């Protein structure tokens, strides 16, 4: 019997408007797409390192800027102003609340750097319904690796069959 539900944050409980954010900064659509690829599809997986919380925001910014000096202003602004990146999904938040009222345990399992997680969840209504969470920056492990899931289950003594 299902007693607990585990949600991801990004692209589940909130949406990202990363491309529009870069356009708001002053990039055209083509440049915004390219800069997004530079950050999110980086062959060195620098954004994944950022999610793991093993390096400071500033060191991640500096590394990206060193790799892409022509885009350093946009990259620096983008990472430093992550509060503009997320979009609330109130209909999903309402559903989370309904599940909580029905007695389900509600948990978060997500890849996030600490600074962005705090900016994206600070005023999120769904947070009041959360029974526990494991975010990559907390244990320096990320999805899809099983370790982060096991850490969530162990911390909150969740029966994996429920």
Language-model segments: residues:
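Short, acidic loop-to-helix structural element flanking the phosphoryl-transfer center
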Residues: 4, 73-107, 118, 146
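Active-site neighborhood of HAD-like aspartate-dependent phosphohydrolases
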Residues: 1-42, 66
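Glycine-rich phosphate-binding loop signature in dinucleotide/nucleotide-binding domains
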Residues: 1, 101-104, 156-162
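Generic structural signal for small/hydrophobic residues in well-ordered secondary structure
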Residues: 8-11, 53, 99, 108, ...
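Short, solvent-exposed loop/turn segments at secondary-structure junctions
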Residues: 12-13, 18-20, 112-115, 139-140
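A metal-dependent, Asp-based hydrolase signature
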Residues: 47-77
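Substrate-recognition "cap/lid" segment bordering the active-site pocket of phosphatases
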Residues: 114-162
């Amino acid at each position: 019997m299902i007693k607990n539900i585990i949600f991801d944050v990004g692209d589940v409980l909130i949406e990202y408007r990363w491309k529009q954010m870069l356009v708001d900064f002053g990039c055209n659509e083509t440049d915004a797409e390219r800069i997004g690829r530079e950050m999110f599809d980086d062959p060195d997986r620098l954004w994944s390192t950022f999610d793991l919380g093993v390096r400071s925001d500033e060191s991640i910014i500096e590394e990206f800027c060193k790799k892409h000096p022509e885009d350093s202003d946009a990259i620096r602004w983008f990472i430093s102003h992550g509060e503009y990146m997320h979009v609330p999904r109130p209909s999903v938040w309402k559903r989370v609340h309904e599940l909580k009222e029905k007695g389900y345990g509600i948990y978060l399992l997500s890849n996030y750097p600490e600074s962005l997680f705090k900016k994206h969840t600070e005023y999120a209504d769904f947070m009041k319904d959360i029974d526990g969470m494991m975010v990559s920056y907390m244990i320096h492990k990320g999805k899809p690796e099983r370790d982060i899931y096991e850490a969530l289950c162990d911390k909150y003594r969740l029966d994996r069959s429920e």
